[in-house]
Amino acid sequence: MSAFYKSTSKFLGILLIIGGFMTSCNIQDDPSTEKQRLLNTDKQFAQMSLDKGAGEAFNYYLADDAMGMSAGQQPVMGRENNYAEMKDGQEDYTLAWEPQRAEVAASEDLGWTWGKYVLSFIDDEGVEQKRYGKYLNIWERQDDGEWKVLVDMGNSSPAPEK
């Protein structure tokens, strides 16, 4: 093997090693990965609502400066105020939801999810009632990388056909 081929092979080998190193140091999150991560976070949020109650779940997943917007009501500003409205009587109802889709901005600091919810409760006559709806949550990625809900809004939908 000539000296030219040896030096060229060595040079190419070094370039490959350096290129591989630089690529591994400059990996950016795949937007589809972050989108799936956000969708999974909303699913965990929904599961916590079933396990611990909606008030506790919202208290955990809302950003400190979150805004809650329920149909027919004034917006509720701040995580603590939203929690105060939800915690009393949370054992009297169940709020379940199923995230349908998530999207994340190219900057990966904002995203949104939407889905369908069912609010179940026992009325004054002891009969189980269900209210159906859809929601849209706007999420903000925190400094620690976790997603928190910045805006929670929802409105009612007709009951699904049986």
PLM ranges: what are they?
Residues 40, 47-49, 86, 120-123:
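Long compositionally biased, domain-poor regions of proteins
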Residues 32, 36-39, 53-103, 127-130:
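A solvent-exposed, acidic/Ser-Thr-rich amphipathic alpha-helical stretch
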Residues 22-24:
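C-terminal motif of bacterial Sec signal peptides marking the signal peptidase cleavage site
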Residues 131-158:
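Short beta-strand edge/turn micro-motifs at domain boundaries
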Residues 26-28:
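Bacterial signal peptide processing site
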Residues 109-119, 133:
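A short hydrophobic beta-strand element
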